[in-house]
């Protein structure tokens, strides 16, 4: 065996040793249950605690299941520090034998709707790379807190049932499956993993900037907690809304098929 392979095996063993921690082992088992994928996939990494935890869990999962995996770090270049941060994250991942590519959003940046446009550009970069490597599955780091925030944002916008069902564990855009295996994870758990495994994560200052709707909604949720807000009950509400939306969608499709069949029979009679 070559020295390179020996070093890789040593790193893999060190990576898997992290699972010895009782809490991380429990979280990995939960992750494994939520993911259940048996083909190659990609992981979107930003450097925040959510995506670093996702990178670690996904890497261990890929080793255990002998799956090919790609890691993409998106540098939006919206802050002067972002490129250095992306490079630091790349080196950090490399330390655990996690090879990654930095995808940069170059060109003129918008002055309005920054987060919305940045999100669109981020997906464009990720989809392009997935198609290049013939990868059909992309893992994203959305977690429980994102689910709650998204729910309240949709309420403010006056969304209907489909919108209130909020983030889906899996949906498809441009023939790429977007998979969110962390939707049952609290952010605090992801911070724990990042601190224990990497002893590092990036704190984006925009996450505290009240000019953004999501930040104001996050603050609103914190205030609700003081009034006895129960996240578990909201999770159940979103789950029920999702089931209702799925049921309604099913019968809409069935109704279309039935009408198509009846119209076909009617034309045959004519």
Q: Predicted segment positions?
A:
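ATP/NTP-dependent adenylation/nucleotidyl-transfer catalytic domains that generate, transfer
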Residues: 173, 211-270
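Core alpha/beta nucleotide-donor-binding catalytic domains of modification enzymes
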Residues: 2-220
């Amino acid at each position: 065996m070559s020295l390179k392979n020996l070093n890789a095996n040593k790193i893999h063993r060190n990576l898997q040793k992290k699972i010895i921690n009782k809490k991380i082992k429990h979280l990995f088992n939960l992750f494994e249950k939520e993911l259940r994928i048996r083909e190659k996939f990609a992981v979107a990494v930003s450097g925040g605690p959510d995506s670093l935890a996702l990178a670690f869990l996904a890497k261990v999962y890929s080793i255990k299941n002998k799956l090919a995996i790609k890691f993409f770090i998106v540098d939006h270049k919206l802050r002067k520090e972002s490129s250095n941060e992306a490079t630091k994250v790349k080196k950090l991942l490399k330390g655990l034998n996690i090879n990654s590519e930095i995808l940069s959003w170059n060109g003129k940046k918008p002055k309005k709707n920054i987060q919305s446009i940045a999100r669109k550009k981020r997906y464009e970069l990720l989809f392009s790379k997935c198609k290049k490597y013939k990868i059909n599955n992309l893992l994203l780091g959305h977690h429980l807190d994102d689910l709650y925030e998204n729910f309240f944002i949709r309420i403010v916008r006056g969304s209907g049932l489909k919108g209130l069902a909020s983030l889906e564990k899996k949906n498809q855009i441009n023939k790429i499956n977007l998979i969110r295996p962390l939707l049952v994870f609290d952010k605090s758990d992801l911070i724990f993993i990042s601190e224990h495994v990497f002893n590092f994560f990036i704190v984006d200052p925009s996450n505290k900037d009240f000019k953004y709707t999501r930040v104001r909604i996050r603050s609103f949720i914190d205030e609700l907690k003081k009034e006895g807000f129960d996240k578990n009950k909201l999770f159940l509400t979103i789950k029920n809304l999702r089931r209702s939306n799925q049921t309604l969608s099913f019968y809409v499709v069935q109704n279309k098929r039935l009408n198509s069949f009846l119209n076909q029979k009617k034309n045959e009679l004519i």
